[in-house]
């Protein structure tokens, strides 16, 4: 379909210059509208603006016409009158780019220095930070100083570097004498906490002359956190200096936990810390003493610190450490240390039942496990497998017939056309706005409508937006079923497993790109793609852009998954963790556990929360997909369940 559309696009473009006036008449059919839309887009890309202007009036009834209008306005935003932009935004209140256009035009009016026009166009605070800075600067320019200073303060108090457009607002605020030096200290604290050393240095250098002593100390501390003890001893003890010292101390602990541990008494004395503040420092160091390389003395100190801690996440980390080393006594100790609310989590209820089974208290344990089985997800399935019972999936059925009123309207019409043109990311923006505006019942119908139209990613997105967790068919559609069947055929990886990986990685959005460069359905990095193509002699791949094509992505992704699956003896726990965190880390974790623990303990003891959640999800998703493919939804194979880790 994709290639056919590209060929059609080229053929249509070839005839653009041959258009006659009669051919510009309004298109009657959707196919004709699509044809004209393609011609206009091609003409626009070729800068044939006379053709664009000639053809656009004939497409006013086409659902994607507002996108053409948007491009027309933004291509010449520097010369647009405010009334044109205002009318467009008002006429298209649900169009995603119209929502960003307001902020863009605020910035344009600021460039023109039309301050009154800016406030007339945007009487309310705009959305983006840059536009807000221009908005409050306009307030100052029109004599509304108090509102300007209030806005400046709100925009100032962040640890991030703000856009250049904010500089002039901050400058007039400072010149007015309304900027309290304490505002500098507060922003320095936020920047220090965010690790923005450059901003800390700039801000400290701008402080008034009578603050130069503390400013110099701040700059030294930001550039070299190891001077924290000197900072603590040479500055007066205030809430600000304590907070700065704590941030620097955390940096020291990341580099040298033992040095930080030994520093705590001196730091506490110099900054007059109370017990809660001292415990915060202990917690910071305790997090860094969870490895296998700690001494007995460090381990005792760590456990003493955690025993006094109020940090639930730190205590949970200690529970997982006990699980990872097969320390049953420690497991019991640290589970008991958890607060009641945390004990109600699925994972800790399961491990409490596990301890009860070990003590022969089978009835109590099974009661907990049966209660868990009433829920959905990883641990409810684990509970069923633990007591040898079948896990019953709870599936809510969405209405097969969708209310026609939901499928009408400009938003749905735009979604249909965007999906036709394979503009998935833009369609997702439209869809998100549409789904968010509906009731839960309507969201279920929209999920079903997307499912019926094979808009797999939109089906999933609707279930997430509506928290429709038991609508499993719409949450886990058999997307790209034929492609997965073809590219897992002859491989050892089950089709359901490959689909579970893709569902976890992309939620079935074929055009998604991660911030680090992973692309497409199975979120493949360009380097991984190149290596896999070479290793498996996959023909036809030449550039990372091809990873956005579903077939190419599935071909390469299933090949790489097969590679890691075979590396780890066809064990999905290992290969899933390796797909997410890398094979090297999985081997390290296996070396640490050294065959002392079972499968569930290994999963729960994975130190990276993202990877731990990833493995749990993939195993559960695999079970769902096996169910929809006609198999039993067992979480783990007998081999995976029975081996030691």
From Swiss-Prot:
Documented EC number(s): 4.2.2.n1
Subcellular location per the Swiss-Prot or TrEMBL entry: Periplasm
Entry GO CC: membrane; outer membrane-bounded periplasmic space; peptidoglycan-based cell wall
InterPro entries: Lysozyme-like_dom_sf (IPR023346), Lytic_TGlycoase_superhlx_L_sf (IPR037061), Lytic_TGlycosylase_superhlx_L (IPR012289), Lytic_TGlycosylase_superhlx_U (IPR008939), Transglyc_AS (IPR000189), Transglycosylase_SLT_dom_1 (IPR008258)
Catalysed reactions listed for this entry: Exolytic cleavage of the (1->4)-beta-glycosidic linkage between N-acetylmuramic acid (MurNAc) and N-acetylglucosamine (GlcNAc) residues in peptidoglycan, from either the reducing or the non-reducing ends of the peptidoglycan chains, with concomitant formation of a 1,6-anhydrobond in the MurNAc residue
Active site as annotated: 505
Region listing for Slt-type domain, in residue ranges: 492-582
GO MF annotations in UniProt: hydrolase activity, hydrolyzing O-glycosyl compounds; lytic endotransglycosylase activity; peptidoglycan lytic transglycosylase activity
Entry keywords, A to Z: Cell wall biogenesis/degradation, Disulfide bond, Lyase, Periplasm, Signal
Superkingdom of origin organism: Bacteria
PANTHER family, A to Z: SOLUBLE LYTIC MUREIN TRANSGLYCOSYLASE, SOLUBLE LYTIC MUREIN TRANSGLYCOSYLASE-RELATED
Family: Belongs to the transglycosylase Slt family.
NCBIfam families on file: PRK11619.1 (NF008631)
Protein name per its UniProtKB record: Soluble lytic murein transglycosylase
Annotated organism of origin: Escherichia coli (strain K12)
Lineage of source species: Bacteria, Pseudomonadati, Pseudomonadota, Gammaproteobacteria, Enterobacterales
